[in-house]
């Protein structure tokens, strides 16, 4: 399992186009970010407009390096797009609200802060914990751990001893996640 970072409408569109495209989808395994950003092409010595997905993987990796997958890969602490020179549009608060209400994660520019991911919604339409990227990534991490660490128990008898072996494997991991603010 993974979170797919989908590219929005082509470069040069507006907020309404970005929200309309996102509203046609419904998945807590995908996220959309908007608008496009300008980055340096170091090989050719020019600047290029690129879709957000070019940078978002780096944001997720940075988030995991300085925090954990269950922290929001967004905001001024973990969402700065260091390679971005500028966002295609300077979004107003109203633009950011419209995008976020439609499950499109705004890429905003703040004075003195640079270009920043300022949202962490999945494309899930129903309001729940799973409409957040960090919650989906937490569940992916937990599922992956449980699947890999308990696969040797799959064909064992369903006994109290087998269940206890499973708990002895999983509970320390969940305790660690909880101690790192992943679960409450």
What spans do the regions from the language model cover?
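Structured, hydrophobic secondary-structure cores that serve as assembly/anchoring elements
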Residues: 1-184
């Amino acid at each position: 399992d993974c979170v797919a970072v989908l590219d929005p409408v082509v470069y040069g569109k507006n907020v309404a186009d970005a929200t309309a495209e996102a509203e046609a989808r419904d998945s807590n395994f995908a996220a959309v970010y908007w608008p496009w950003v300008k980055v340096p092409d170091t090989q050719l010595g020019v600047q290029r407009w690129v879709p957000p997905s070019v940078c978002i993987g780096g944001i997720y990796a940075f988030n995991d390096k300085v925090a954990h997958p269950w922290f929001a890969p967004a905001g001024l602490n973990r969402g700065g797009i260091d390679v971005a020179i500028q966002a295609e549009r300077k979004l107003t608060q109203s633009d950011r609200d419209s995008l976020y209400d439609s499950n499109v994660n705004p890429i905003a520019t703040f004075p003195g802060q640079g270009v920043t991911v300022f949202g962490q919604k999945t494309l899930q339409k129903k309001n729940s914990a799973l409409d957040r990227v960090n919650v989906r990534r937490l569940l992916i991490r937990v599922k992956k751990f449980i699947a890999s660490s308990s696969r040797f128990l799959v064909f064992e008898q369903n006994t109290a001893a087998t269940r206890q072996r499973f708990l002895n494997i999983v509970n320390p991991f969940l305790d660690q996640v909880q101690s790192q603010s992943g679960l409450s």
